């Protein structure tokens, strides 16, 4: 082998090794921690768009009892902008036969590690919910939702809103009357809550 070819060969091996290293790093990238400040329940931000469109003054039938059970609520967690970009790229590569990631599907756990909230952030949020008296029921494997349960009073105090009864086309509903608020420290991760609004099952005649 000539010296020139030897150098080229070594350079090629080095480049291939670097590519493998980069791809391995992409495959095993961990979600970074985004909650970096202490959680202060006095320093809040409102989450726009978290009030149901049917929760209007015309439909309002008054505040619910504070002890009303509110079960299986879902706190929705969001990805960082970098995670969203990486996810879009991966989705495109999974459909590209020329990509090394073609049809390389992720398990829910792998998805959570790469595109969900970090385990540290999940732990901080779960601790915050429990400190407020909620029961944390489960955390999705993809780390995009935390299921929790409590009472209307706990929801009102935790999220700085009121839970009201509403009547819409003859059907009873329960929903928050205003957009919810959360501690500012949780803003980079928390997107909102699912199931604060639900329809009341009609009682049998």
PLM features per residue range, with description:
Residues 1-15:
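Bacterial N-terminal signal peptides that target proteins for export
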Residues 1-4, 25-30:
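Basic/polar N-terminal segments that are highly enriched at the extreme N-terminus
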Residues 11-25:
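Bacterial N-terminal signal peptides
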Residues 30-205:
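Non-catalytic regulatory appendages
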């Amino acid at each position: 082998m000539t010296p020139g070819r030897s150098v080229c060969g070594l350079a090629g091996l080095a480049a291939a090794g670097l590519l493998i290293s980069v791809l391995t790093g992409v495959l095993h990238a961990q979600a970074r921690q985004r909650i970096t400040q202490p959680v202060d329940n006095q320093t809040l931000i409102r989450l726009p768009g978290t009030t149901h469109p049917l929760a209007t003054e015309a439909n309002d039938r008054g505040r619910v009892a504070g002890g009303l059970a509110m079960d299986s609520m879902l706190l929705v967690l969001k990805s960082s902008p970098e995670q969203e970009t990486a996810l879009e790229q991966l989705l495109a590569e999974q459909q590209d036969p020329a990509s090394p990631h073609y049809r390389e599907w992720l398990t829910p756990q792998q998805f959570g590690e790469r595109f969900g909230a970090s385990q540290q952030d999940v732990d901080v949020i779960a601790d915050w919910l429990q400190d407020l008296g909620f029961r944390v029921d489960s955390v999705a494997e993809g780390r995009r939702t935390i299921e929790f349960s409590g009472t209307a009073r706990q929801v009102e105090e935790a999220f700085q809103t009121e839970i009201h009864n509403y009547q819409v086309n003859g059907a009873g509903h329960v929903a928050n009357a205003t957009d919810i608020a959360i501690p500012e420290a949780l803003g980079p991760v928390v997107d909102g809550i699912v199931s604060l609004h639900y329809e009341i099952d009609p009682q049998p005649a």
